[in-house]
Amino acid sequence: MTVRQQWILVGVVVLVLAGGLFAGVNIFADDLYPVGVGSKAPNFKAKDLQSRAPKTLADYKGQVVLLNVWATWCEPCKAEMPSMEELYRSYQPHGLHILAVSIDDYVTEDSIRAYAKDLGLTFEILHDPTHAIEKAYQTTGYPESFVIDRDGVIRRKWIAAADWNAPGSRALFDELLGTRPPMNEGAGAVP
């Protein structure tokens, strides 16, 4: 083999290795680019159980979104729902959208609707029985929640039930929505 042929062979090997690396990066991109605070929120598609139409995160572009991944069998999920509903009622007039995505795969959509109705939930309930949202957001537990700002960036991530009416939670939504904290009557708050 001549020197020229050796260099051509080396060039081919380098190109094959570079191509393999490029393909590997694209195939395993989820593992290389974790979803977390400061990252762009991945788009997803799930069925809205009220309208029965598919919804995507892109439908809420430019909006503040609390994305909650939950299941009907999850007791911590159920425990946090009342505070999430209270947060929604306080901040929905200011533009907050709550997307609660049920990942139940062995429960009917009617059962999920009844569950939400029994809890008095008025925010959007979506359903993803394929668990695609879990893969996209790399969730590790239930409930798992993501606060997404108007630019589509994840600002906070919670794994486990949260008190959505805690001062820290409300301060975050006040900041993102450009609102002032609600006044408590009789609490001596000064405007």
Question: What are these model-derived regions, one by one?
Answer:
Residues 65-67, 99-101, 146:
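Conserved hydrophobic packing residues within short motifs/helices of P-loop NTPase cores
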Residues 44-65, 88-91:
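A short beta-strand-turn-helix
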Residues 113-151:
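Short, internal strand/loop/helix patches
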